[in-house]
Design a protein with these regions (language model features):
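N-terminal pro-sequences and low-complexity stem/linker regions of secreted or lumenal proteins
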Residues: 60-657, 662-683
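Intrinsic-disorder-associated, low-complexity terminal segments enriched in Asp/Asn/His/Tyr and depleted
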Residues: 15, 37-38
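Cysteine-centered motifs
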Residues: 2-5, 23
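Basic polycationic patches enriched in arginine
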Residues: 11, 24-25, 30-32
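Context-dependent free N-terminus signature
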Residues: 2, 29, 44-45
């Protein structure tokens, strides 16, 4: 037997034993009120592995599975102002326009895709007979509109407009309280580089802005874990420490809410993640040109101002301008620090009207530098966006209870609205590029900017350099993902995809600054806002998505058709009964598709009903019962806890604590452990 095959054999044994350990821990935990017996579980795993490892008779390096300790470099790159639906709503295998759990507005009694319109909205007015607008393809007019809309704008990204669009959880004011352009979207042909990177590695379809507002609140959370609202972990009066950061105001002093309370006070003085990195002995560097679009918010903190005056290391690493060319060079030579932050120039940031195409050119250069650099085999590169930029998305994260510290505040612009959530907000494009996420599928855990901090904390701990960002709100730390489930350390693939060509971003010949948006708007005489298709839509065309699937990673969320697969079989509802059928490689058999209906109150609550697809969007079909039958009555439905560990999913009936299983083509609930692979499917 070849070394590779034996290594794979042992890895498979490790995964199998690990899955069994996970199940036994789960069973023990339920029996003991949530307290797991880690010692006995470890002995089970050891007993399962020793004979297999001995039989393999290989060096440890051949059999060992990877770990977070194998990651030597982490690269963060945050772009600007794009929403998930706006970019990836049509993508196959993600929670997009094909969402079977789409929210039904209590105001309209329709899925939120039906956005009410009237003549009070900003932008082009609808004809009097048109009462609603669906999401619409921005380049529906054809011709050169694929170039024109590159430099168009949507609407407002501020607190007021985005809370209005949310509308207390009804999501039905995107057009009325922003603009009809807000619900426009691109397709694959408009974003070939973005799609290629996301699908060649791991795309996240549950990554949320941390604050339902603009750039500074979100970028500051990305680097500190907080905006310092009242009762937050930072504490102290805003006039002393700064915050609460509600908008992009950067001038000294404080703005005021409509009742006169201080907000967005400057300078800010609470502790930042880079300071924790320095204390832990972790090297880091912000790579940015002098033109950085103001996207390095560390300059707003007094400690960085003081460090710059004294020419100290904190300022050299956090607020200086080594340039993006320095990043490309360091990546190529394998000289990147342990943690790198990439900050975009204005015209390459993708912030409307700055073009996705120019942003793609920068993304391609950064990805190429990382993937072709000498440290690619031990690097994790995380690409995210700060906030939605006035573009619509149809999913917002569950919010914390109102008594959670730092999570709610009296609406700063209209106190009559009462308490408002600070976040997490709508979803953003997000992908992780690394040898442990190659062809990784879709990551479904609720995630936000705080998640990147928590990933760094876990990574630092694995390297013996622990730190803890105490400024982060406790609810975010408890309920947002730390991204560890996104990486599959049982698979290691350093192959590099062929990336599509992207035209070189243009520069002004005099100033040498990038000027793509200016060139675009001048070429088309600023006629870049497409016609709003009032009265010309049908819902099927508006919500057309790519047919396909992606393997899932991470704890599950709603919003997708699923196949439950085990071995050669898939769960089925053929013949109006729960059964098992031979799985389809295309995952397009309707009777093998199911939909989850979430019963939880917070993101870590993983209780679901499992149903067949409904005949209407947002409605369930028939539910799986505890006796493994099907019922149209939700009261008859079994409640399952579905969790992800060791690369598979356990599906446990919460009443009997038995595992849903497919054994030799038969469906059962059994006491022994069973694991499924889940695929997210669009049809």
């Amino acid at each position: 037997m070849c070394v590779f095959c034996v290594g794979a054999h042992v890895r498979a044994a490790i995964n199998t034993a690990g899955a069994e350990l996970t199940c036994r821990r789960a069973i023990n935990g339920r029996a003991r009120g949530g307290q797991t017996d880690h010692l006995s579980g470890s002995m089970v795993l050891l007993a399962a592995l020793l004979p297999l490892v001995a039989a393999a008779a290989l060096p440890a390096s051949a059999a060992a599975s990877g770990s977070l300790k194998d990651v030597k470099h982490v690269v963060f790159f945050m772009q600007e102002n794009r929403a998930f639906d706006h970019y990836f709503g049509t993508m196959a295998g993600v929670r997009g326009f094909g969402d079977p759990n789409v929210h039904i507005s209590k105001n309209t009694n329709k899925p939120m895709w039906h956005q009410p319109v009237d003549d009070s909205l900003e932008g082009p007015k609808p004809p009097s007979h048109v009462k609603e607008l669906y999401p619409w393809y921005l380049n529906h007019q054809g011709g050169d509109w694929k170039d024109r809309t590159q430099c168009m704008i949507a609407g407002s990204n501020d607190w007021i407009a985005n809370h209005a669009a949310w509308n207390h959880g009804q999501y039905d004011r995107w057009v009325r309280n922003n603009t009809p352009y807000s619900i426009g979207y691109y397709r694959r042909e408009d974003l070939p580089l973005h799609f290629k990177l996301a699908e060649s590695f791991l795309v996240g379809d549950a990554y949320h802005e941390s604050v339902i507002s603009s750039t500074d609140p979100n970028r500051i959370t990305w680097l500190t874990g907080t905006i310092n609202t009242n009762t937050s972990e930072v504490g102290g009066h805003p006039r002393k420490l700064g915050g609460p950061v509600i908008d992009n105001t950067r001038s000294p002093g404080c703005s005021k809410t409509d009742v006169g309370a201080p907000m967005t006070c400057n300078p800010k003085r609470w502790k930042t993640v880079p300071e924790y990195l320095m204390e832990a002995g972790i090297t880091f560097q912000f790579y940015q040109d002098h033109d950085n679009f103001g996207c390095d918010p560390l300059v707003q903190f007094q400690q960085y101002k003081d460090a710059a005056k004294k020419k100290e290391e904190l300022a050299r690493r956090g607020t200086s301008y080594p340039g993006l060319e320095k990043f490309y060079q360091d990546a190529h030579e394998g000289k990147l620090p342990e943690v790198s932050y990439v900050v975009p120039p204005t015209d390459l940031s993708e912030h409307p009207p700055y073009t996705p195409r120019d942003g793609a050119w920068l993304q391609r250069k950064v990805a190429h530098a990382v993937m072709h650099g000498k440290a690619w085999n031990n690097t994790v590169y995380i690409l995210s966006y700060d906030e939605t930029g006035g573009w619509a998305d149809h999913v917002m994260s569950p919010h914390a209870p109102r008594d959670e510290p730092g999570e709610w505040m009296l609406d700063p612009y209209n106190h009559t609205f009462g308490q408002a959530p600070t976040g997490p907000g709508f979803r953003l494009p997000f992908y992780i590029i690394s040898p442990w996420t190659r062809n990784g599928g879709v990551f479904t855990e609720p995630t936000s900017h705080e998640s990147q901090i928590m990933f760094l904390e876990e990574w630092a701990k694995a390297h013996g350099k622990p730190f803890h960002s105490k400024e982060m709100n406790p609810w975010r730390r408890k309920h947002m993902s730390n991204l560890l489930n996104a990486l599959d350390f049982s698979k290691y693939d350093t192959s590099v995809p062929d990336l599509p060509h992207v035209p070189t971003a243009t520069k002004d010949p005099v100033t040498h600054r990038y000027n793509g948006a200016t060139v675009c708007q001048k070429k088309f005489d600023k006629h870049v806002q497409p016609e709003v298709p009032y009265g010309k839509q049908n819902l099927t065309d508006a919500l057309r998505v790519e047919k396909g699937f992606k393997p899932m990673r991470g704890n599950p969320t709603e919003g997708r058709y699923l196949t439950f697969e085990s071995g050669k079989y898939a769960l089925s509802h053929k013949g109006n009964k729960v059964s098992a059928g031979k799985k389809s490689s295309k995952r397009d058999e309707h009777d093998q598709l199911f939909v989850l209906h979430w019963l939880g109150g917070n993101p870590r609550d993983l209780r679901f009903r499992i149903a067949t697809p409904g005949k209407q969007m947002g409605k369930a079909g028939k539910y799986i019962t505890q006796k493994l039958g099907l019922s149209s009555n939700a009261k008859d439905a079994a409640v399952f806890e579905i969790t992800f560990e060791n690369g598979g999913y356990s599906v446990v009936d919460t009443q009997s604590h038995k595992h849903l299983a497919l054994d030799n083509g038969k469906v059962s609930l059994k006491g022994d452990c069973s694991s499924f692979s889940l695929y997210s499917v669009t049809i």
